[in-house]
Amino acid sequence: MGKVYDWFEERLEIQSIADDITSKYVPPHVNIFYCLGGITLTCFIIQVATGFAMTFYYRPTVTEAFASVQYIMTDVNFGWLIRSVHRWSASMMVLMMILHVFRVYLTGGFKKPRELTWVTGVILGVLTVSFGVTGYSLPWDQIGYWAVKIVTGVPDAIPVVGSPIVELLRGSVSVGQTTLTRFYSLHTFVLPLLTAVFMLMHFLMIRKQGISGPL
């Protein structure tokens, strides 16, 4: 094992990378409330894992979506647990994100030179809420259907561009298969990818600038 490690160490300098990660200075004022962002990340990872597991059984069609969710809950081994953990971690992610925003705002973590870190955090907040909106519709039950109809109908009140925005969100004038397909694509591919990119940017900036000081 030693020779294998030495081979990789010679080429990748693993030890120097590990030393840089583990030797980062942590200010003495940091407490448990500074862990809220990390907890949000943990919830996101759980979301990805459990969501990926459910894609093996979920069918994104208006005729089969609800039945496939019922199948996951009743027939798939531990399917009820996987979906429940997905729902619980989704709620926890939103809660931790809100608390994290409050902590950053109250401690002045958004001030110079961390403005861009705050901007990426706000974008992550919007993406998190978008996860909730798109995921809520996927079972395609009465609650999900009417929630989508109401949410996608809100832009219709905007003059001139309202109707095109509604059609863009729904895929047509009315809510139907194209709407479910778009929401499924957003929920399982577009939003996770964007969230991963902005989380990486967010953490790299925190890594570069360090944790903000006390008030």
Curated annotation (Swiss-Prot):
Q: Any idea where this protein resides?
A: Plastid, Chloroplast thylakoid membrane
- Name a biological process GO annotation: respiratory electron transport chain
Classify the protein's membrane topology as the record does: Multi-pass membrane protein
Looking at the keywords, is Transmembrane present?
A: yes
**UniProt remark on cofactor binding:** Binds 2 heme b groups non-covalently with two histidine residues as axial ligands.
- Anything further noted? Heme 1 (or BH or b566) is high-potential and absorbs at about 566 nm, and heme 2 (or BL or b562) is low-potential and absorbs at about 562 nm.
Name used for this protein in its record: Cytochrome b6
- Please report the organism this UniProt entry assigns to the protein: Zygnema circumcarinatum
- The gene that this protein is the product of is petB
